A protein has these predicted regions:
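Conserved acetyl-CoA-binding loop-helix of GNAT-fold acetyltransferases
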Residues: 44, 50-63, 87
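Short glycine/proline-centered loop/turn elements that form peptide/ligand docking sites
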Residues: 54, 58, 79-83, 97-104
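Conserved hydrophobic/aromatic "anchor" residues
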Residues: 26, 48, 84-85, 90
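Acetyl-CoA-dependent GNAT
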Residues: 1-40, 45, 58-59
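Short coil/turn motifs at secondary-structure junctions
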Residues: 32-34, 47, 80-82, 111
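Accessory recognition modules or surfaces
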Residues: 26, 51-58, 104-111
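Conserved GNAT acetyl-CoA-binding A-motif
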Residues: 65-78
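Conserved catalytic-core motifs of GNAT/GCN5-like acyltransferases
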Residues: 74-76, 91-108
Length: 112
């Protein structure tokens, strides 16, 4: 069972995907002071992976970030997740090493 981030829920920043009345996945969009937004997720229940839920959550997150007037949406992707983000229109900007291992900082431009 997924644990949804209570502070982000209270701030209205969480998008939840329901499947048969249960939370099957979620994504968080956090606006930044520099006019960009950070994408946290998507997180999808493992038994529902590869069913399009992650893509739907990212599409909703893009629309939400645009409604917040963010010019760019940023995501941190593990090597395994990087192809998924590329399919969602993100491009790698740089590689960094975190306590969880290497990640690609990826960007999707929202406003021309």
């Amino acid at each position: 069972m997924m644990m949804l981030p209570a502070d982000h829920i209270a701030a209205g920043l969480v998008i939840v995907f329901e499947h048969w009345g249960e939370a099957a996945g979620f994504v968080v969009v956090v606006p930044r002071e520099d006019g960009k937004a950070d994408l946290d997720g998507p997180f999808v229940e493992p038994d529902l992976w590869r069913g399009g839920i992650g893509r739907k959550l990212v599409d909703e997150a893009v629309q939400f970030a645009m409604a917040l007037e963010a010019a760019e949406l940023l995501a941190s992707a593990s090597p395994r997740a990087e192809p998924f983000y590329e399919k969602c229109g993100f491009v790698p900007m740089k590689k960094i090493v975190t306590t969880h291992g290497p990640v690609a900082v990826m960007s999707r431009t929202l406003i021309d």
